[in-house]
Amino acid sequence: MPSDAPSSLASTRNIGIMAHIDAGKTTTTERILFYTGVNYKIGEVHEGGATMDWMEQEQERGITITSAATTCIWRDHTINIIDTPGHVDFTVEVERSLRVLDGAVAVFDAVAGVEPQSETVWKQADRYNVPRIAFVNKMDRVGAEFHRCVDMMVERLDATPAVIQLPWGVESDFRGVIDLIRMKGLLWKSEDKGASYEVVDIPRDHLEAAQEWRDKLLETVAENDDELMELYLEGEEPSEEQLMAGLRRGTLASKINPVLCGSAFKNKGVQPMLDAVVDFLPNPLDIGATIGHSVSDEDAEVRREPSEDEPFSALAFKIMSDPYVGKLTYIRVYSGRLTGGSPVLNSTKDRKERIGRILQMHANHREDRDGVGAGQIVAVVGLKNTTTGDTLCDPNAPVILESMTFPAPVIHVAIEPKTKADQQKLGTAIQRLAEEDPTFQVRTDEETGQTIIAGMGELHLDVLVDRMRREYGVEANVGKPQVAYRETIRRKVEKVDYTHKKQTGGSGQYARVIINLEPSGGDGGGYEFENKVTGGRIPREYIPSVDAGCQEAMEFGVLAGYPLVDVKVTLLDGQYHDVDSSELAFKIAGSMAFKDAARKADPVLLEPLMAVEVTTPEDHMGDVIGDLNSRRGQIQAMEERGGSRIVRAQVPLSEMFGYVGDLRSKTSGRASYSMQFDSYAEVPGNVAKEIIAKARGE
């Protein structure tokens, strides 16, 4: 951080910039860095020169893959910005950055409006209760419609937009914005790349609309703020300060979302958006105490106030490998103060760690810091055992902060090294990448011995394989993408009795267990284990072994060897032998009892369903719908948007491979689509038979 940076909590903002792919998010961040004086040359995404997109693949693909954290100063406030990816395959990046942010700027495309990934990200932000302002970008583009975008925020996001700016002109005539708080026009100058703008009176032909929208603004804010409601009912006009204060209170309470507009690419509207970040988004003090729990008791609540006088606590939200300094762990400090070289406790794993260096990150260059206090986001070097979602804290005042939830992968491929020399490197690369990305999973196929990598989509795995090649020099052959099917059960089976016995001279093995198995009604990741054994029929030290055996059996289902999910095991009874019983014997008994029970419990196959949205010209509508139906798709909605037709459907992932090429040829390249994981559902009988036969090699 620059040495003159204000460090007080009240003047700190930790924000994310979130949006759909291509809404102009990275360009917006670049402009922020330019106007706050961090960059001297503006980087353009389509030239591959954006500061935030610093990985090679991002510069080639023009999309943001990892959320880089950058610090800048505006109006004597420190703004820590996390640039998040908008592509659905990288949802994990958005999820983890929202957990550590205090506020966010949602960037929308004025032409496309609220797109599917915008909805996903908005709902993620709702879940973490992150206050947001909205920036309607690309106002200079043909087909830009500000008001339709605002309407879509209401319809699709269930938001309460408080419009504080109107566009001045539209498309190629877009010149600036009309500020409804100050009732002034703002015009940008092109000669200094939009670094300065003129404040002018609102032109006559815009005055009526401005007055009408200002009245709407006052009404929206008053409806969500008691203080302004009183003024409103008395017919009094609030002062600029009162209106700003009401907007801030409403935004912090997540009741309203101030909406601004502009064109980041054309350098218009970025500074007022930065003003809105400072004026309306929360500082760490507004967010208040972070709630965690005691290390010894999950139900015992522990509070950590955002103050440097409190004991140190922080959350590790991202791991990255840096070619120069090694493993970087990004942390958000919630309380206390951290200095370089100090010992900390990783309370999640109960391991002591030592902080080496503390680094303030600017997209891809870094600055050493001696220490860092509550409310800041930095990267630290020297942590050996810390992974995403772990809590770091003062060893004398342990606490575990709320972690993050990550979706399970939906697609997997087999990967093998091209040469013997690549074998070792592949292992290292996979281990490092799995450390960085919790949604990237690795396992070995027991039958074929192949290494299987799994992720959130084809692009996700492409990028990971690409990184193996570039960063670790691994040349690998990658198989065809396979769908991550799962299995579950449909009915309860009771008192399944299994005895594991092996008594052939010497010490034998003996364990008997009796279990119930039933569906747990979860949504894809559920497993419950309940122990109802009484009277010491199975000694207490063997109970975890039965649980472990059941969990091991779940990894390979009874139908086709896919993981079994959403089950509850109840251990009812059993027997042990003084000499021959062991942890291993009970683990095997648990595993075999589970498999027996699963076979009897009406097992079924589950497949991932994707929410697909296709944008197509009207004359290709029939072809698109026919094609989706042929892929076992269920059409859920159709609507018109700016001369195009939108088809929303739910389609099994297994039917979507190669869809991009088929859609192109059916619509002469005029249609586009986006898809994201929706849910798991039962595979129809005839299709399931084929999948099971294939998995069994029949």
Curated annotation (Swiss-Prot):
Please state the protein's primary subcellular location: cytoplasm
Q: Which SMART domains match?
A: EFG_C, EFG_IV
UniProt function note: Catalyzes the GTP-dependent ribosomal translocation step during translation elongation. During this step, the ribosome changes from the pre-translocational (PRE) to the post-translocational (POST) state as the newly formed A-site-bound peptidyl-tRNA and P-site-bound deacylated tRNA move to the P and E sites, respectively. Catalyzes the coordinated movement of the two tRNA molecules, the mRNA and conformational changes in the ribosome.
Q: Which residues are listed for GTP binding in this entry? A: 19-26, 83-87, 137-140
Q: Which InterPro entries match?
A: EF-G-like_DII (IPR053905), EFG_II (IPR041095), EFG_III (IPR009022), EFG_III/V (IPR035647), EFG_IV (IPR047872), EFG_V (IPR035649), EFG_V-like (IPR000640), G_TR_CS (IPR031157)
What is the name of this protein? Elongation factor G
Compartments, record wording: Cytoplasm
The cross-references to SUPFAM superfamilies, in alphabetical order and at most eight, read: EF-G C-terminal domain-like, P-loop containing nucleoside triphosphate hydrolases, Ribosomal protein S5 domain 2-like, Translation proteins
The similarity comment for this entry is:
Belongs to the TRAFAC class translation factor GTPase superfamily. Classic translation factor GTPase family. EF-G/EF-2 subfamily.
* One GO MF term attached to the UniProt entry: translation elongation factor activity
Q: Which domain of life is it from?
A: Bacteria
Record's GO cellular component terms:
cytoplasm
| Residue ranges annotated for the tr-type G domain, each copy included | 10-285
Q: Which UniProt keywords apply?
A: Cytoplasm, Elongation factor, GTP-binding, Nucleotide-binding, Protein biosynthesis
GO terms, biological process = ribosome disassembly
